[in-house]
From Swiss-Prot:
Residues 43-54, 70-94, 256-276, 468-484 have a biased composition (Basic and acidic residues). The keyword DNA-binding does not apply. Plays a role in the assembly of microtubule arrays in the germline acting redundantly with ptrn-1 to control circumferential microtubule assembly along the body which is necessary for larval development, viability, and morphology and integrity of the epidermis. Required for microtubule stability and anchorage by binding to microtubule minus ends. Recruited to hemidesomosomes in early embryonic elongation to direct the nucleation and growth of non-centrosomal microtubules. Residues 1-10 have a biased composition (Polar residues). Keywords: Cell junction, Cell membrane, Coiled coil, Cytoplasm, Cytoskeleton, Membrane. This is Non-centrosomal microtubule array protein 1. It comes from the Eukaryota. Its main location: cytoplasm. Residues 1-134, 250-277, 465-491, 533-563 are annotated as: Disordered. The gene is noca-1. One of its GO terms (biological process) is nematode larval development. It is found in: Cytoplasm, Cytoskeleton; Apical cell membrane; Cell junction, Hemidesmosome; Cell junction, Adherens junction.
Length: 922
């Protein structure tokens, strides 16, 4: 977590603002710093000057004299998140404030002479603390005025907060309107007073301006007090104390326990017990002595100042890190270059934060052998450059205004070069007599010649001793406890850091001796001496010189002669006062802008509140509708449940009826499936019978054809028998006279006729023609001689074909018969394929066994039996005519097969089932 510091305020005062880099921008930081500075106003005023409010209280207005109730206090002292009502708007405050002070502001901003010269009286100067009453802070109702800077006014003696008296805005004037009486902030410091107020009231910081989480800002003046953020909650024993008791009490002083070494390590240091120590009281004396020579312009010797007034930390030769820095006086104007232009109005009069690297933290071990811890630089170098100071990486566009001084803790063995500035050891810096006239002259010459009039001094860090564990717990549990100091000079301070397991910030500080009360007494004595010196100088000097001479006389033990360095110092102080006047004017303009911005933020906040109220009302309406809808749905659900419970019995009865119907339908379905199986079996049987019917029809057709052939054969035989009878009759008539050669031949041929008649015997018996049997030998014995004669005569006239031709006719007839049977079976197979049925392949393979009819087999047997006998002309003609009929039938069957195959192929392509595995006929 990085720290950013911004310093602003009047002379001897500054506002230390530490922000977190992860929370908010620099502009918001500066805005909160301005609000915090201008908002810490107190209602306490001096009794003898009721109509002259101090600087910074011009905007304080009490609309009611009634103190806030404890309930209001408890609400105000919360965590800073609860808004509180305001009595009047910020825009009205700004209008009243600037209407009363516009003329003074314009005249003061154009003048180069200092106007804010504070005169010191016996009761308000650097005297005792008797003029400060016991402070009990009462919270104002205005949040902007609740945290006004206390460094801008001095409490009046005997003033009590319990008085409800408050002046109006018209009766109040700024403190510099009356040039005859102005005031210097008295000791103790404002930080100490703030701590005292916090111990007496838990509601010191307003929750609007003080935010422990985002921005932490405190007001401090020239003192040895450490800048830190405190917890608003204080223990009971710190309540209701007077200021002197608070200053003398050991509670205010920092405790040293066993945890100091751990705290130093957490802060980034390496503590050792042998580190040279700078006591707070002795440091005050040394700084006061040196200030008379360097004109109050203190800078750490290892810092680099560029013409823009920026600060650049030099690298340590020992550890390569940077020592912590504490800003103790207001600095000159400069602006960071990388910020946007519209941010410069908030930042041009404030010191930007230090760009200090985290890894460049200095070590306290480098202080062991330090021989030149305190060195004064005259600001010049042999080659014309300002010693070891190099320009920073900050802005270079803002003019230089050298205001205020800084003190930086250094941990290098030798901070400056030996040829650039005189060196002083730790022992030498204890006495002012060790600083001789040559050193003074060198400082005067350095102020005249260098471009920056600021000279530097480095202060050694304080050694840390262990704290007791119980004291560490007390610090973590209780409020912040710091050490106060008197005087207007600043002593070195350390960087704030966060203690573990605690939300408050503590500082590493030097150990406190047991003679803390003696130190307070010494400081009070010193203040009284300074007061007497101030009274002596005020009688014969101007108001401006009176203030500076009082500081000078405090350093030189009452010396009344003004040297050249003192004149230069007075001139510089005049310039500083003029710069402060310009800063006041700028801050007033910034305040107006801040009030305008606050008013604008209030308007935006009101708008957001209205929108949120509207959204909440709409959400409430939506919620109401949603609740009503849910209630309606619940009612419907209850009704549905009731209806379901009442209708369970009816539904159960219907369910049983449906189950019975389903069971019956399943039984009917099973019966239908059984019937379908039977029908499919019958259909298969029908298809088989159908195929057998076709076969039987084909066989019947063949038998009919054979029957017709037999009939024709019978008719031919009858004609031949008639012819033979006729011939026999003729022979008998011609041969009636006796034996002739023809009769002898008939006797010889009688042995051959049975063989001729043999082929017809079976046919005649089959047809039942018993009358057509050949003539008996007994009946024809009388004609033998005449018949033989006729046979001899007719044998010479008979026309038979050759035996080879007869065999060819018989073979051709047999092949035609087989082809005819094959074609018939193939036709039946193709017909079944066309109908989508499985073909009977076994029938095709067994054509000869299944297809050949009995008549055809008998014909084959007859032809084989008569194969040796040649055909006659008439028999040959009959056989050829039969063969022609068979060939015609064969051609007809082949044409039918061709047509069926064509139809089957087209049907297969149309159905996309051309690749199915079926019986293909080659």
């Amino acid at each position: 977590m990085s720290n950013e510091r911004v310093s602003t305020g009047s002379l001897g005062e500054r506002l230390m603002l530490r922000t977190r880099s992860t929370r908010g921008s620099v502009r918001e930081t500066l805005s909160k710093a301005i609000r915090s500075t201008l908002g810490r106003a107190s209602s306490m005023e001096r009794k003898d000057m009721p109509d002259r409010p101090k600087y910074g209280t011009a905007l304080t207005a009490m609309t009611s004299t009634t103190p806030p109730s404890p309930k209001d206090r408890s609400s105000d002292s919360g965590d800073g998140d609860s808004p509180r009502p305001r009595k009047f708007s910020s825009k009205e405050c700004a209008r009243i404030y600037f209407s009363n002070t516009s003329s003074e502001h314009s005249s003061r901003s154009n003048s180069s002479t200092p106007r804010r010269v504070r005169h010191t009286t016996a009761s308000s100067g650097y005297g005792s603390l008797s003029h400060l009453p016991p402070i009990s802070y009462r919270k104002s109702s205005d949040p902007l005025n609740s945290l006004m800077s206390q460094s801008m006014y001095v409490q009046s003696p005997g003033m009590h907060i319990d008085e409800p008296k408050c002046t109006s805005l018209s009766q109040r004037r700024l403190y510099y309107e009356d040039s005859s009486e102005t005031y210097i902030p008295s000791s103790p410091s404002l930080t100490t007073l703030k701590d005292f107020m916090m111990t007496n009231d838990d509601e010191t910081f307003d929750d609007f301006d003080f935010d422990n989480d985002d921005v932490k800002s405190v007001i401090s003046s020239a003192s040895t007090s450490r800048i830190f953020s405190v917890d608003n909650r204080m223990s009971k024993y710190q309540k209701n104390q007077s200021l002197r008791q608070f200053l003398n009490s050991p509670v205010r002083l920092r405790k040293r326990g066993d945890t100091s070494r751990r705290d130093a390590v957490e802060a980034g240091f390496e503590p050792r017990d042998t580190v040279p120590r700078c006591h707070s009281t002795q440091s005050l004396r040394d700084v006061q002595r040196v200030r008379s020579y360097n004109n109050s312009q203190f800078q750490a010797s290892d810092l680099s100042l560029n013409p823009n007034g920026s600060i650049r930390a030099a690298c340590d030769s020992t550890s390569g890190s940077v020592a912590p820095t504490a800003v103790v006086n207001p600095a000159r104007n400069h602006v960071i270059s990388h910020r946007q232009q519209h941010h410069t109005s908030y930042e041009k009069d404030l010191i930007p934060h230090h760009n200090i690297d985290v890894d460049r933290r200095r070590s306290l071990q480098a202080l062991n052998g330090s021989s030149a811890l305190y060195q004064l630089n005259n600001g010049g170098s042999p080659n014309g450059v300002r010693s070891q100071f190099s320009p920073s990486d900050l802005s270079i566009h803002t003019p230089v205004h050298h205001v205020g001084s800084r003190v930086r803790v250094s941990s290098v063995n030798q901070i400056c070069d030996s040829n650039s500035a005189p060196q002083f050891s730790i022992d030498q810096r204890r006495s002012v007599h060790n600083i001789g006239n040559p050193v003074r002259n060198s400082f005067v010459d350095g102020i005249k010649t260098t471009s920056t009039p600021k000279n530097q001094i480095a202060v050694a860090p304080l050694a840390h001793k262990s704290r007791h564990l119980s004291e560490s717990r007390d610090e973590m549990r209780g409020g912040a406890e710091r050490r106060g100091s008197g005087g207007q000079m600043n002593l070195p301070a350390y960087t704030n850091y966060l203690i573990r397991h605690s939300g408050e910030e503590r500082l590493v500080d030097g150990p406190v001796t047991n003679a803390s009360d003696a130190r307070i007494a010494y400081l009070e004595k010193r203040i009284r001496e300074l007061e007497l010196t101030q009274k002596e100088q005020s009688s014969h000097s101007t108001p401006s010189q009176s203030r500076h001479s009082s500081s000078k006389s405090s350093h030189f033990n009452g010396s009344s002669n003004l040297s050249t360095s003192e004149q230069l110092r007075l001139q510089e102080m005049s310039d500083e006062l003029a710069n402060k006047d310009r800063k006041v004017t700028s801050l007033e303009s910034k305040l107006l802008k801040a009030y305008q911005r606050i008013e604008r933020l209030n308007e935006e906040y009101d708008g957001k509140i209205k929108n949120l109220m509207y959204d909440s009302e709409r959400a409430r309406d939506d919620l109401t509708r949603c609740v009503d809808k849910i209630q309606q749905l619940e009612n419907e659900l209850d009704e549905t449940r009731a209806a379901v419970q009442n209708g369970d019995h009816a539904n159960e009865q219907e369910y049983h009826e449906l189950r019975d119907k389903i069971w019956k339908q399943e039984r009917e379905l099973q019966e239908s499936r059984t019937l379908l199986t039977r029908l499919r079996e019958k259909e298969a049987e029908f298809e088989r019978m159908r195929s057998e019917k076709g076969y039987l029809e084909l066989k019947n057709e063949n038998l009919n054809k054979k029957l017709e052939a037999k009939k024709r054969a019978v008719e031919e035989l009858e004609r031949s028998v008639s012819t033979l009878r006729l011939e026999q009759t003729i022979c008998q008539q011609s041969c009636s006279s006796g034996s002739t050669p023809l009769a002898d031949e008939m006797e010889i041929m009688s042995d051959i006729r049975p063989s001729l008649a043999r082929p017809y015997t079976k046919a005649h018996s089959t047809l039942g023609s018993h009358n057509m049997s050949p003539l008996s030998h007994s009946k024809s014995s009388g004609l033998t001689k005449s018949f033989s004669n006729f046979a001899l005569n007719s044998s010479k006239q008979r026309d038979d074909i050759t035996a080879n031709m007869s065999r060819s006719i018989r073979e051709q007839n047999r092949h035609i018969t087989m082809c005819r049977a094959m074609v018939v079976c193939l036709k039946d197979t193709v017909d079944r394929m066309a109908r989508g049925e499985n073909p009977d392949v076994a029938r095709l393979l067994g054509v000869k066994l299944n297809v050949m009819s009995e008549s055809e087999m008998e014909d084959d047997e007859d032809h084989e039996a008569d194969a040796s006998q040649p055909f006659s002309m008439m028999s040959a003609e009959s056989a050829l005519s039969k063969q022609c009929g068979k060939l015609a039938d064969l051609d007809k069957d082949l044409d039918t097969i061709r047509c069926q195959l064509a139809d089957w192929h087209g049907q297969t392509n149309a159905e996309g089932d051309g690749d199915r595995d079926v019986c293909r006929v080659q």
